[in-house]
């Protein structure tokens, strides 16, 4: 398993083991609310981003009533405060660029929490545009190789034929990167050929990765973990080359 895949697997497992399911549901609900509002529809058949958010929520056993409540909030049918999507930028130890996607109903609270987390963990919050140029918007499709009958080489060719820009294969997963606007078409092409898709989402992918020394890399990973643990933070992206060896050292 690649370092990035292993890192997110560990984070998901730790979330369950630490009884953070409530926090997970909050983040999933915010994804659904933002997707509903941005897509202008509460119908997943008409709103692809919402469909992906609902599929991810159901994969994590989120109750249907929670999903509907989040959709209603996005449609303005709720008494809850409106959410806004905000991006934060900064640097971690070793010059690691960090891009944060947040969803909040209180910008001042989130600003304060993000800045404090950077400052307490060896990082530096940055101005808008300070690191975002190092990332590009992509679609990401993840396939669990243990759940498919096709071999990795065949899957790679299928993905490229469907329009993928890049395919990363390791022992357990196959990650397909594509233009975000092509995500639905490529996902559907794979499903039509009998390939189960474990996850599909819009991401910000670093254009290049860096490898600071181990001390700085571990410190950067600690900062990323702290940022991911903030209630208002949905996703954290970085240009850190998260190797399997680094994750093993971090988890030791």
Curated annotation (Swiss-Prot):
Cite the GO molecular-function annotations of the record. DNA binding
| Pfam families noted in UniProt | TACO1_YebC_N, Transcrip_reg
What family does the Swiss-Prot or TrEMBL record give for this protein?
Belongs to the TACO1 family.
Map out region (Disordered) in residue numbers: 1-22
Q: In the record, what lineage is assigned to the organism producing the protein?
A: Bacteria, Bacillati, Chloroflexota, Chloroflexia, Chloroflexales
Q: Which GO terms describe its cellular component?
A: cytosol
HAMAP family, alphabetically? Transcrip_reg_TACO1
The UniProt regions of compositional bias labelled Basic residues, in chain numbering, are 1-14
Where is this protein chiefly located? Answer: cytoplasm
**What GO terms describe the biological role, i.e. biological process, of this protein?**
regulation of DNA-templated transcription
Tell me the NCBIfam families matching this sequence: PRK00110.1 (NF001030), PRK12378.1 (NF009044), YebC/PmpR family DNA-binding transcriptional regulator (TIGR01033)
Where does it live in the cell? Cytoplasm
- This protein is called what? Probable transcriptional regulatory protein Caur_1043
PANTHER family given in the database record: TRANSCRIPTIONAL REGULATORY PROTEIN YEBC-RELATED, TRANSLATIONAL ACTIVATOR OF CYTOCHROME C OXIDASE 1
Q: Which UniProt keywords apply?
A: Cytoplasm, DNA-binding, Transcription, Transcription regulation
């Amino acid at each position: 398993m690649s370092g990035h895949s292993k890192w997110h697997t560990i984070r998901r497992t730790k979330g369950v083991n630490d009884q953070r399911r409530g926090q997970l549901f909050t983040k999933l609900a915010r994804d659904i609310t933002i997707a509903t509002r941005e897509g202008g529809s509460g119908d997943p058949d008409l709103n692809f981003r919402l469909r992906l958010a609902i599929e991810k929520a159901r994969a994590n056993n989120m109750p249907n009533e929670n999903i509907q409540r989040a959709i209603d909030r996005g449609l303005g049918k709720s008494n809850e405060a409106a959410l806004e999507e905000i991006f934060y930028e900064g640097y971690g130890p070793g010059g690691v660029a960090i891009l944060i996607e947040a969803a909040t109903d209180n910008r001042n609270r989130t600003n304060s929490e993000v800045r404090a987390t950077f400052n307490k963990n060896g990082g530096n919050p940055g101005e808008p545009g300070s690191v975002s140029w190092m990332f590009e918007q992509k679609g990401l499709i993840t396939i669990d190789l243990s759940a498919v009958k096709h071999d990795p080489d065949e899957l790679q060719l299928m993905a490229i034929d469907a329009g993928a820009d890049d395919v990363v294969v390791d022992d357990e997963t196959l990650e397909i990167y594509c233009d975000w606007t092509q995500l639905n078409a490529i996902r559907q092409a794979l499903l039509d050929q009998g390939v189960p898709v474990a996850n599909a989402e819009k991401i910000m992918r670093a254009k290049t990765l860096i490898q600071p020394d181990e001390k700085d890399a571990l410190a950067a990973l600690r900062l990323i973990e702290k940022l991911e643990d903030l209630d208002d933070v949905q996703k954290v992206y970085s240009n850190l080359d998260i190797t399997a060896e680094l994750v093993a050292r971090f988890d030791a």
